[in-house]
């Protein structure tokens, strides 16, 4: 069990690496479908609504995508549905459900 845990940790990128890579990769929701799993991205748009648990609906005005925002990150963000936001995270592809974004940073965009 410990070996599996260490191996899984070795494959995961640290948040600071994701932030560096995403700073150079501003994309639209429609472009995400063409990206590989674990690609670091930055998105700007509107947080539409909280769906359940860590899942939120996001739109960049062109397309919609699900955001997976951990509870501790969400509580610290002071963001609510309808806010314009900038999201930094990783593309998370799945075999049997739609692609989403695993969020490592979210901040409100002031108008």
Named regions from a protein language model:
Residues 1-5:
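Bacterial N-terminal signal peptides
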Residues 9-111:
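OB-fold and OB-like single-stranded nucleic-acid-recognition modules
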């Amino acid at each position: 069990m410990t070996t599996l845990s260490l191996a899984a940790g070795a494959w995961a990128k640290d948040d600071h690496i994701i932030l560096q890579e995403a700073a150079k990769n501003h994309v639209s929701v429609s472009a995400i479908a063409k990206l590989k799993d674990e690609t670091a991205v930055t998105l700007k748009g509107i947080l539409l609504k909280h769906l359940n648990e860590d899942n939120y609906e996001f739109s960049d005005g062109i397309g919609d995508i699900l955001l997976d925002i951990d509870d501790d990150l969400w509580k610290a963000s002071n963001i609510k549905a309808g806010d314009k936001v900038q999201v930094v995270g990783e593309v998370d592809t799945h075999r049997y459900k739609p692609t989403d974004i695993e969020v490592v940073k979210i901040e409100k965009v002031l108008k």
